[in-house]
């Protein structure tokens, strides 16, 4: 593990079925019918070379149209969240239920930085898929974590490293920026820890919805505000989070980029 603190701030005290996708922990299986002994041995030898699928992959089926009502204007805790121009959100990144094969239990969150997609596992080979923004070059991390805490309209406190890097921009928020529409954490923040340690990584909303589908953050997972509110409502705390590698493979351990 190489150490770098994430930069998302201090730790606080009717959907449709869509495309078929493969989860990172789903083992490929095959049925072998009775054949001659030599042929059977050959097939078994070949099967031994087949590796489990390690990253979600789309089939050739076309995506359904996501419900545009997900992105209408709404009021939450007194904050007026504006409607989004759905036609400008790539359909791949719109919230929708997809077929998703995974051995992970319902409630698990799987994030694929390569495809910029987050999956909330529903069970029965289905998941809710959301578009996300991920860490830019040099800030990508991977591994397993848990949901340690959740906050609506959270206060954002920039880490000392961020203030030192751009004091003119961030020093005014050294004491914390209250929750609101311009707060970088958006409408909700989901705080992650790994091995009991807080590295500063969050899944959170963002006023910069156009950054969804891009490598744009300092390591946190950005979501559209309407989407993070939906994901937040499904969590109870303690859920497993799996962040795949930058190439979309299952992580072999925790990787935190060096400062």
Per-segment meaning from a language model:
Residues 1-33:
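N-terminal secretory signal peptides that target proteins for export/translocation
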Residues 23-221, 225-259:
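N-terminal pre-domains immediately preceding structured catalytic cores
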């Amino acid at each position: 593990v190489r150490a770098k603190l994430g930069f998302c701030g201090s730790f606080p005290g009717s959907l449709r079925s869509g495309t078929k996708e493969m989860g990172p922990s789903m083992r490929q299986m095959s049925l072998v019918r009775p054949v001659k002994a030599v042929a059977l041995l050959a097939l078994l030898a070949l099967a031994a070379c087949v590796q489990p699928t390690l990253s979600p992959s789309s089939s050739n089926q076309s995506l359904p149209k996501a419900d545009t009502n997900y992105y209408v204007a709404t009021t939450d805790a007194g904050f007026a969240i504006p409607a989004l121009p759905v036609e400008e959100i790539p359909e791949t990144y719109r919230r929708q239920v997809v077929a998703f094969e995974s051995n992970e239990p319902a409630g698990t969150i799987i994030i694929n930085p390569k495809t910029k997609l987050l999956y909330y596992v529903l069970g029965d080979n289905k998941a809710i898929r959301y578009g996300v923004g991920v860490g830019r070059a040099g800030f990508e991390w991977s591994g397993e974590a848990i949901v340690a805490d959740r906050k609506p309209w959270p206060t954002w406190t920039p880490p000392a490293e961020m203030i030192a890097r751009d004091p003119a921009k961030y020093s005014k928020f050294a004491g914390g920026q209250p929750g609101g529409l311009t707060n970088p954490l958006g409408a909700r923040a989901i705080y992650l820890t790994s091995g009991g340690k807080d590295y500063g990584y969050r899944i959170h909303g963002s006023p910069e919805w156009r950054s969804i589908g891009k490598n744009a953050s300092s390591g946190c997972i950005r979501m559209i505000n309407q989407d993070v509110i939906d994901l937040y409502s499904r969590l109870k705390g303690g859920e497993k989070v799996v962040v795949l590698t930058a190439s979309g493979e299952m992580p072999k351990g925790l990787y935190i980029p060096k400062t």
